[in-house]
Amino acid sequence: MLTFILCIAALVVGYIFYGKRVDKIFGSDDRETPAITLNDGVDFVPMKGWKIFLVQLLNIAGLGPIFGALNGALFGPVVYLWIVFGTIFAGGVHDYMCGMLSMRHKGASISEITGTYLGKVMLQVMRVFSVILLVMVGVVFSKGPAGLLALLTPEKLDATFWLWVIIIYYFIATFVPIDKVIGKIYPIFGICLIIMAVGVAGVLLFSHEYQMPELWNNFYNQHPQNIHIWPFMFVTVACGAISGFHATQSPMMARCCTSEKQGHKVFYGAMVAEGIIAMVWAAAGVSFYENTQALLEA
């Protein structure tokens, strides 16, 4: 339990101090943001800071810090170190820079920013790569929730039914102004994601039924199939440490920020929140089951 508490504390301290340091180095100021100067009522729409944070959290998280962290837990408590240090020094910086660079470049996407600095060839490469990446992520973030919803609803509402519902929702959310659907629904889902993590953490901390193993007693690879920590643990836990996919999402909220001063809370803060969620689920993975073999079989 002490390891878990120290890791959560480290993430919070990292947000407060290292996140502020990153913000200071970047030099956020009081200049007008694209949400103000390019306000079109569609993509560039000023939104409240707390809404932007929750939308950003849901955009970058989804099921990633749950599935990824649980798979990462197969390696044992050593996964905690990757989540903590990856979030503070890699993921948080990556997401912050992507969001702030977009804000400084009139809300440009990651591919357009790449083209600005690396030329037209890399612009086209990043456009193709981004489309492929988004299709792959879209498939995962469609099939996963559809399967879960099918388990929670009557048998006639199978995974195929929910998959179509999700796809239709995607199209609606994409074609209407960002504050009409995404800005209204995503904050609710973001709160649900946080509440779920708090609930699981509460069980871990206050239930005597589960024992959280300490890192110092389990500082070795516990994967039941002897899969190497390097590089597999680091690519297994992406959402929850660092994920390049986030670069495609941060510009969406960069177009809604009303001040560059929101960058620390929205971009770095959402990544730290995702790291905390990943920590909770990784701890659940190593605690709820007798060993990593039982977790794998589950």
Q: What are the language-model segments listed below?
A:
Residues 10-66, 262:
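Membrane-interface "cap" regions at the ends of multi-pass membrane proteins
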Residues 117-120, 124-125, 188-203, 271-276, ...:
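Small-residue-rich segments of transmembrane alpha-helices in multi-pass membrane proteins
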